[in-house]
């Protein structure tokens, strides 16, 4: 494997760094079931670059996609509440405006936040439909020391009480949505079929790198220990730092593309700029650990049991 400047690491892989704070393209690998050396190299590269992109993986189907995921960790079930009968992957399909067009880290309303997500393009619109990722590690590192110290002691409530009526829907999709709202209503009902609430530290320690990162996103309902207006102000200070353009990378999808991101160190946003065209993506997530604060305290479950969704996969955390 060759890193940014061509240093040999493992097999024929080559890593091309795409921006200063986040993102790399990995060439020279056919995804599927991997040997241990290649899998370890990809996991190591993921921890370094936060999000990896693989081109030319047209051969992948759900089975080989799952085999690739198994090479890198322990796959979760598709989702804690959404049902995908007979499938081990989560099918993300546009439904006249539905989509993850808000900044978020995947599934933070449970205690065992996934380690990583692996997303594959299945059907793409003729224009638009890109995805943007942001480094929550870079965001923390850029904070002035007084704000780092403040964030280090804060906790936030995350839950899945997401208001689908407030989705930011492209006006081009409104007519289709109004004509057939059943898809959104069914999706929302499934999403809310079980209530999950977890208290997470605003700053978590990465269990492999020891880096500190901001754990926020659209599943945060409030910062604990302060009033509503203070919570909103604190959230905006830290969330806005995450989404500075210098901390982001935007990927324009092609068929055959696969993206893999470290869910412990990133947020992402699926850009809803493709009108009423179809967009289908398949995702598999890998089991992760329970976040740990800079003081060594684990996240706390308030409501919901995620044991059927995922095991806990906990490498030993260390404080940076």
Regions found by a protein language model. Name each.
Residues 2-260, 264-320:
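Fe(II)/2-oxoglutarate oxygenase catalytic core
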